């Protein structure tokens, strides 16, 4: 009987000790801090607190910038110019008539040009730009053809060849023009004020040397077109002062010959002005 009583007391003691400890409860993890990254900053919010701590990273990512350097020698193919041709007439028509180059009565008014119709078209096969100093100072050169069309206001003017003789005809044509085409090599010193920009601002100046490879007198009367091919005593070689102005995407060009365009008879200095269509 005593053994049974002692066993019951022992069992009750063990059961009460197990009842004091909850073995089914799961342990809760400790609260974590909130971390937010914005660019080069890290914002940390402490657990259970309204305070925020801002930490700046020491590492920065650089923006992707174009690092390509301009080439020291660049080539531009097939450049086109579109402008106007004219000339400064300082001819002595009395002397020209005496020499038999022009007919009596031919003067400055008879050889006056139509400003809006007298066109200049240049086609440059290529132009190159050579860097001299930091792409600000450059040398530009190339090769191409100059096409000059001198349209006369006087629709009765007539050009004869071998020998050259300019006279007043009786037929009134719809169009009368003298065309002079040159193979030309230009060379200019270029100043680029914005070398890192594609369409920047700059100016160029220099000289060009041209060779007259074709000339013709052309008339048009309705559907009838007549051409007389001859050099008409025009100078074979032409030296000109040339210039170019770059205003962003707009480019202007101009030229002024160094001397008279005729070998004899007349004294006319040609010049041109217009727009240039090129990459630089």
Give, region by region, the residue ranges found by the protein language model.
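Outer-membrane beta-barrel transmembrane domain signature
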Residues: 131, 172-247
């Amino acid at each position: 009987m005593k053994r049974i009583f002692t066993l019951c007391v022992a069992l009750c003691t063990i059961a009460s000790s197990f009842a004091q400890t909850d073995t089914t409860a799961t342990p809760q993890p400790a609260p974590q801090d909130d971390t937010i990254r914005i660019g080069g900053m890290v914002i940390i919010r402490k657990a259970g607190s309204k305070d925020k701590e801002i930490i700046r990273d020491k590492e920065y990512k650089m923006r992707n910038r174009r690092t390509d350097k301009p080439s020291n020698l660049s080539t531009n193919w097939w450049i086109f110019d579109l402008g106007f041709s004219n000339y400064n007439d300082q001819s002595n028509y009395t002397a020209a008539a005496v020499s038999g180059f022009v007919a009596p009565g031919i003067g400055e008014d008879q050889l006056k040009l139509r400003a809006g119709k007298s066109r200049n078209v240049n086609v440059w096969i290529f132009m190159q730009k050579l860097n001299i100093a930091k792409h600000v100072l450059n040398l530009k050169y190339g090769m191409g053809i100059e096409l000059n069309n001198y349209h006369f206001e006087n629709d009765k003017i007539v050009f004869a060849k071998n020998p050259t003789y300019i006279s007043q005809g009786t037929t009134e044509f719809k169009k009368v023009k003298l065309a002079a085409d040159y193979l030309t090599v230009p060379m200019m010193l270029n100043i680029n004020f914005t070398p890192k920009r594609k369409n920047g601002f700059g100016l160029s100046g220099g000289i060009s040397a041209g060779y007259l490879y074709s000339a013709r007198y052309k008339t048009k009367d309705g559907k009838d077109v007549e051409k007389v091919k001859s050099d008409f005593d025009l100078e074979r070689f032409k030296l000109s002062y040339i210039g170019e102005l770059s205003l962003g995407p707009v480019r202007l060009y101009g030229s002024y010959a160094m001397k008279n365009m005729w070998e004899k008879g007349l004294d006319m200095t040609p010049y041109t002005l217009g727009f240039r269509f090129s990459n630089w």
